[in-house]
From Swiss-Prot:
Monomer. This is Alpha-L-iduronidase. One of its GO terms (molecular function) is L-iduronidase activity. Glycans are attached at residues 100, 180, 233, 326, 362, 405, 441. Alpha-L-iduronate binds at residues 81, 171-172, 254, 289, 295, 339, 353. GO terms for cellular component: extracellular space; lysosomal lumen; lysosome. Residues 1-16 form the signal peptide. Keywords: Disulfide bond, Glycoprotein, Glycosidase, Hydrolase, Lysosome, Signal. It comes from Mus musculus. One of its GO terms (biological process) is locomotory behavior. PANTHER family: ALPHA-L-IDURONIDASE. It is found in: Lysosome. N-glycosylation contributes to substrate binding and is required for full enzymatic activity.
Amino acid sequence: MLTFFAAFLAAPLALAESPYLVRVDAARPLRPLLPFWRSTGFCPPLPHDQADQYDLSWDQQLNLAYIGAVPHSGIEQVRIHWLLDLITARKSPGQGLMYNFTHLDAFLDLLMENQLLPGFELMGSPSGYFTDFDDKQQVFEWKDLVSLLARRYIGRYGLTHVSKWNFETWNEPDHHDFDNVSMTTQGFLNYYDACSEGLRIASPTLKLGGPGDSFHPLPRSPMCWSLLGHCANGTNFFTGEVGVRLDYISLHKKGAGSSIAILEQEMAVVEQVQQLFPEFKDTPIYNDEADPLVGWSLPQPWRADVTYAALVVKVIAQHQNLLFANSSSSMRYVLLSNDNAFLSYHPYPFSQRTLTARFQVNNTHPPHVQLLRKPVLTVMGLMALLDGEQLWAEVSKAGAVLDSNHTVGVLASTHHPEGSAAAWSTTVLIYTSDDTHAHPNHSIPVTLRLRGVPPGLDLVYIVLYLDNQLSSPYSAWQHMGQPVFPSAEQFRRMRMVEDPVAEAPRPFPARGRLTLHRKLPVPSLLLVHVCTRPLKPPGQVSRLRALPLTHGQLILVWSDERVGSKCLWTYEIQFSQKGEEYAPINRRPSTFNLFVFSPDTAVVSGSYRVRALDYWARPGPFSDPVTYLDVPAS
């Protein structure tokens, strides 16, 4: 494959098509680049009163480990439906309503373990107790439940942590998916006031938004528009005051297969909101289900590979380049979430709207589960290298400048760490995407010209690259004949192509200019990361733990929160059978904070330790070791 990649790097420009020119000026920062895209979500299946069986399943525990392992907090939030169905309720004589939070505690602990925040929808009815929010007693009891819940988790995790949570209303109220709860429009407003006051009692720093729905033009979406009217000038159920707080407005606009359609719909909704309710012109806007296509379980080939990854990047770039860069826009856009943390199922391991591909391997004793990292999850790690300030960048073809609604696009950023010019970095991410369409037999010539890079200590750059030939477990699976129960060797081969193809660090050219010529398939992603050498080597890897897969296989997961540097080449993983002499495990360069160890020998019992290596081959300190005792063969 390295020979193939070398040939790819040296490929001459196609004569049949004029090249796309991507110009980036590292000396021209334009505006802050805030990572508004670091969110995902999922919904447990019916029946929702058994949500614990899905949310706390081993499969979901593995899934959340993968999501939490995106480098540099590349995904921070998981937005979950029906959380309150993880609580049970009973009414006892003389004691009133009693709640059991055991399952919800366990699930939130699981998020904490993976350094993830909940997008906390106040959705569900504990043990089916709440049935009617036009019933004033139930409205008061709901306020008490919300207050109890918030105070519980402030006590458990601390106010600093819980104040980061996005509490939100019941999902999509105009879709009337309330299970057995009667929810009129007035009942929904009563419910909202109870959520607001319950949270406020716990702490005024807790934020609440909604309604998390489509906001179709009036007279459609009556609950959406009624909530805005109520928060603007309605009467608070509890205080009698005019108006109720609305800390953010959440809406759902998906793309119907089109990237630009998401932004166009958002802009239309927000324009109508601001016309009808000018008091909300500064209220943060969340699109917390901004998927390119509705229907998470609908199998689509493009959801399986780099097509989906490049499309997600394109949507984000359109928001940054067409919305944040638009000085005439008054929209305060804060969050874009893809609702793609579901678990895929047979016979569609790759092609549903998921971040991982799940294989339920039932031909082992006992049966076990394997997950593979799809490119759409891998690319969130590339996106995490974009931070600091957005740089001036331009795409043109034959002299005509192209906006982000074209096949080739770019996002570029520069990072100036406080107090240490020695750790300056610049990131350029180029995508080729025709939305949901792949063109396997067509490549386009692209020239990158990066200028304005200041001189720095040991200045180097790396190149990372993804396409459907070199970086697609789905393509590998297809070439194997789509086995239902892949063997250990087949899983190893698929995992060989989970990461981008990485071109080793090389010195940045003198005079602060770099020119690269590439032939890029559609879809593909090309990232260039330029760094000066930090004064110190990487910090220590922390939170190392081992999770069992099956006999002779395990997962190692760790945290990069103390590593500090983003100029990382790989993590070195060492193994010792006796816990004395360690030897490195041979693997491809990867900065993903998770590794599946599945050696030919099937010998995995022993001790493990991990350390980061930066672009200058400097190691950080080893993590504390973790010891693993293998699952016995049966």
